[in-house]
């Protein structure tokens, strides 16, 4: 396919997904589809609605906005409560969808969105923390920091503090990024480990460093986008902190780029084991890299030369994994369904573990980031 054909196909693909989805039955939430349970407020749908709202902002097409509003309105009640969401679950994943409430509030001015924003903020006010001050990833994972959690919570936190709290929590957010750099960055590769256990008690944690053993691509992807999204919401008056996160972002992109597959432009599921048996070129993390870099270049956080790396990742992913079925339906393959640490399935962070998780098509953890990268691509035109 030519680049123009890919961009056209992606536009058709998004339209296909939203035409076949609702808040009760999102086609892109494969975990929900497989479970057979009613849908809940969750980060996976949050990724897709963020992508739809971004498409609206870029194209001006109202269908993306009205779909997003209907989706969110299924959950958000007039009093600001959110159906199926419990702040006291203390799960950072559940904060992710909250970013979209700011957008809807700005467009519609409906106070229920403002109240719902406060509902989600209430979770972060009492979210358990490590001794150094980082949010626990979930209440059920005590003393643990996961890279994923930076994307799930920090952009919402930074936006709330900047808009409504006189920037009081902004330096706290910055410090959480610096703690992650201190504890989770590998000096040799520049990559960050998926998880960190401050208590050093988990079976997956290194007894000295507290880190999990491997570099999972999607976790790195979430982390890169988190830095871009936080900078976008941060006031430049916070001179040192703003530049500190920007420097961290630039260094991370430089380090990650070294692991980009020369032929395809993609990245491997476990980043530093290219070609290992069971390893594969993975869609979601590659798309997150493309989006983080394209957006970072557009907003001036990253040098323009990096855009070529992102375009190679974007088109490489589409060439390899985006296809049209004989019945006219479209699909995006090569998406790792899920990966975590600990829990009842004894997820140990080993290579064998990351290679064993299901690889699926059309899940929003891959679709959402690719569509976000697509919005950046069409904005460049």
State where each predicted segment sits.
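CBM-like carbohydrate-recognition segments
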Residues: 2-44, 63-65, 74-92, 96-98, ...
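Long, well-ordered core segments of solenoidal/helical folds
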Residues: 7-26, 66-83, 115-134, 167-203, ...
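Core register positions within helices of long alpha-helical scaffolds
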Residues: 51, 58, 100, 107, ...
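Inter-helical turn/loop segments and adjacent helix faces that build the functional surface
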Residues: 59, 108, 160-171, 230-243, ...
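Acidic/His metal-coordination segments adjacent to aromatic residues that form catalytic metal sites
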Residues: 76-83, 134-139, 199-213, 268-278, ...
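Extracytoplasmic mature domains of secreted/periplasmic and thylakoid-lumen proteins
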Residues: 87, 92-154
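Short, contiguous, pocket-lining structural segments
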Residues: 145-152, 165, 169-172, 207-223, ...
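Oxyanion-binding "anion nests"
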Residues: 224-274, 278
């Amino acid at each position: 396919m030519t680049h123009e054909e890919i961009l056209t196909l992606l536009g058709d693909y998004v339209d296909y997904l939203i035409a076949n989805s609702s808040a009760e039955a999102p086609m892109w939430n494969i975990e929900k589809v497989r479970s057979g349970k009613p849908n809940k407020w969750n980060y996976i749908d949050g990724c897709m609605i963020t992508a739809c709202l971004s498409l609206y902002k870029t194209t001006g097409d109202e269908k993306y906005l009205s779909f997003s509003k209907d989706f969110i309105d299924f959950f958000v009640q007039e009093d600001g409560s959110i159906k199926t969401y419990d702040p006291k679950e203390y799960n950072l994943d559940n904060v992710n969808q909250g970013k979209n409430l700011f957008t809807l509030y700005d467009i519609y001015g409906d106070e229920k969105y403002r109240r719902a924003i406060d509902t989600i903020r209430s979770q972060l006010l009492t979210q358990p923390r490590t001794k150094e001050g980082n949010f626990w990833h979930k209440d059920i994972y005590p003393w643990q920091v996961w890279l994923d959690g930076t994307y799930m919570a920090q952009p919402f936190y930074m936006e709330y503090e900047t808009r409504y709290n006189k920037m009081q929590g902004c330096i706290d957010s910055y410090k959480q990024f610096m703690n992650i750099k201190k504890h989770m960055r590998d000096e040799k590769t520049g990559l960050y480990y998926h998880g960190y256990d401050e208590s050093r008690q988990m079976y997956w944690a290194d007894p000295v460093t507290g880190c999990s053993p491997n570099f999972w691509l999607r976790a790195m992807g979430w982390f890169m986008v988190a830095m871009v999204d936080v900078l976008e919401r941060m006031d430049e008056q916070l001179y040192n902190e703003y530049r500190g996160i920007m420097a961290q972002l630039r260094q991370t992109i430089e380090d990650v780029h070294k692991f980009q597959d020369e032929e395809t432009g993609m990245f491997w599921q476990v980043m530093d084991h290219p070609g290992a048996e069971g390893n594969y070129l993975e869609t979601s993390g590659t798309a997150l890299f493309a989006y983080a870099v394209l957006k970072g270049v557009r907003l001036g956080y990253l040098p323009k030369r990096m855009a070529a790396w992102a375009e190679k990742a974007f088109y490489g992913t589409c060439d390899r994994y985006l296809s049209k079925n004989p019945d006219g339906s479209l699909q995006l393959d090569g998406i790792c369904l899920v990966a975590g640490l600990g829990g009842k399935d004894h997820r140990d962070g080993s290579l064998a573990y990351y290679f064993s998780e299901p690889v699926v098509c059309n899940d929003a953890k891959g679709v959402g980031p690719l569509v976000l990268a697509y919005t950046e691509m069409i904005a460049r035109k």
